[in-house]
Structures are given as C-alpha cells and as structure tokens.
Amino acid sequence: MAAEKKKFNVDAWEPKTQVGKKVKEGTITDIDYIIDNGLPLLEPEIVDALLPDLEEQVLDVSLVQRMHKSGRRARFRATAVVGNRNGFVGVGMGKSKEVGPAIRKAIAHAKLSLIKVRTGCGSWECGCGTAHSIPFAAKGSCGSVKVELLPAPRGVGLVAGNVAKAVLGLAGIKDIWTKTFGDTRTTYNFAIATFDSLNNLNFVGYLPEHKKTLGINEGRV
C-alpha cells in the first residue's frame, strides 16, 4: 500500500501522560527534545502533533493462528511503517480479530518506536558530503533475517527489497546498497531487521572531523 498522510486535530486530543500534556500545552515543541532526552513516548498522538508531515504505510496484513484448548483461534497481524522522509522512521506490528483494528495498532506501535536516522555520504565513490545516503555500513537482524546497509553514491537509488525500500524511503534515505540473509519473505522480520540496522547507525562512534567529510546528520536535514 502507498504511504498516506493524515491530519491530526490537536484540540480534540486529551493527553494522558506528562509528556503528552506538555506537548499540548506547547511546552515541548520538538520531537528531537523527547528522543534526545530519553523521555517516554507512550502516546502516538505526541508524534502526530510534533511531526505533522508523517506518512503511514501498511506493509503486510496476514492471518495467523494459534492453538487453544477450545480449538484454533485466528487473528490478523498487520505490519506498518511510519516516517517523514526526512530523518524519522518507525516500524510496528499489531494483532486483532479484525483487519482495521490490527492496522491501527500497527501504526500506533510504529509511532511509539520512532527513531532519529543518521544520514550522510559514506561512499568512497561519491564524497559529496550531503545527507543522501548513510555515513557508514550497519547491520541489523530479527529472527532469521539479517540486513546489511552499505553507503552508495548519489544516483544509485534504493537497491533493496520492497519491504526494506519502504522503510528506507520513509526514513529519508535516497541512495543505498543492501545485503540480506535469511527468510526475507517474513515481512515483519524483514522490516524490523532493516529498522534495527538504521537504529544501530546511532551507536557508531566517529571523530569530530568525520562529521563534515562524511556529511553526518541526525534527524531532519
């Protein structure tokens, strides 16, 4: 499914957490402040209020079953990704007896898992110093799926599977090479492995002089 933007009415929102109340009052006006200070992100409406340009995309809806003493019980499992195509992305999963609630749960979970993405230009073939790719290679995994992200020169595009392409695109990355291992047909594992590799970029240390040469940027460009 294509990514969608939805309008959020802040006035109709009744926050339940301290962070949510501060956002509605206008005390907190930037999502960076919440993420950088490790504040609890417990309401998806916080993300809606601070990132109005956020897009939502459903990656997969599947029917899952489990055995119970009364017999088989079937539920729908949805996988979704959210992002603003400019340094913020989140992936989530939701389950329910109906498709609609499962999708809504997945989108809400994706918003609560939102991270800042570190972008840059780490390809030796490019060296333009702009935030069109990633500054260095990164790996991530989920279940049997392993994903490796490699910096690519400008103009290459997103060389990745459809699921990884959706996650990387909503994160704001324009050029990248990827390597995948394991059963990538499992949409949720593939999406989380890609998300995990993006998140692992934030834990790579670098020297101050590399910030300019690699064009390292965190969050919005």
From Swiss-Prot:
GO molecular function annotations of the record: rRNA binding; structural constituent of ribosome
InterPro entries: Ribosomal_Su5_D2-typ_SF, Ribosomal_uS5, Ribosomal_uS5_arc, Ribosomal_uS5_C, Ribosomal_uS5_euk/arc, Ribosomal_uS5_N, Ribosomal_uS5_N_CS, Ribsml_uS5_D2-typ_fold_subgr
Entry coiled-coil feature ranges: none
Entry's Gene Ontology cellular component terms: cytosolic small ribosomal subunit
Gene3D superfamilies: 3.30.160.20, 3.30.230.10
Domain S5 DRBM: 54-117
PROSITE patterns for the chain: RIBOSOMAL_S5, S5_DSRBD
Keywords: Ribonucleoprotein, Ribosomal protein, RNA-binding, rRNA-binding
Pfam families: Ribosomal_S5, Ribosomal_S5_C
Any single biological process term in GO: translation
Family: Belongs to the universal ribosomal protein uS5 family.
Subunit (UniProt): Part of the 30S ribosomal subunit. Contacts protein S4.
Function: With S4 and S12 plays an important role in translational accuracy.
UniProt domain comment: The N-terminal domain interacts with the head of the 30S subunit; the C-terminal domain interacts with the body and contacts protein S4. The interaction surface between S4 and S5 is involved in control of translational fidelity.
Protein name in the entry: Small ribosomal subunit protein uS5
Organism: Methanococcus aeolicus (strain ATCC BAA-1280 / DSM 17508 / OCM 812 / Nankai-3)
Gene from which this protein is expressed: rps5
